[in-house]
Amino acid sequence: LIPSVEMVKFAKNGSTVTTAALKIARAYTGRKYIARCYDHPFFSYDDWFIGDTPLTRGIPEEYHSLTLNFRYNDIASLQQLFDQYPDQIAGVILEPATGSHPENNFLHQVRDLCHRNRALFILDEMITGFRWHLQGAQTYYNVEPDLCTFGKGMANGFSVAAVAGKREYMNVGGIKESGAERVFLTSTTHGAEMCGMGAF
């Protein structure tokens, strides 16, 4: 259905799959820093994101220091991070759009900057997926991510989400991964519940 997607892993909520995407990026690249778009309001309840908000109580400072911020439609702010942290950024995560459309091929510039620096380009399509276009905002804006995440409109409100992308990256968390330690991506008490998958 979606050209960039060669492999999918399902979960129950968006926080789980955005965090899974970052685990894949870190495991694949061997790097620790994540760059996230500061202008997009929510990516996850996990420490990598909440530790970078005012609600840091209970989260060690080390988590905050590993998340870097750039601004939407400001490619210079992302370039500055790559200059400041050369060969250290594992992945860049952002929503394709929220209140503003990407200007001056911003998403394409982000993708190209990621690839020049050997970082993974991750689109969080929790809101835009199956809404901007049946194949996601990535098709609407004609840009192909390395990894992407979906939820919300995916099953009309039922509890199901997905991390998806190129097999080369997704295999890092695959059960058939050999020759390297497998990345533990997702698990949940209610993982076997199938109503959400049925709705999808």
Feature map (PLM): residue ranges:
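Conserved N-terminal phosphate-binding loop of PLP-dependent enzymes in the Aspartate aminotransferase
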Residues: L1-F200
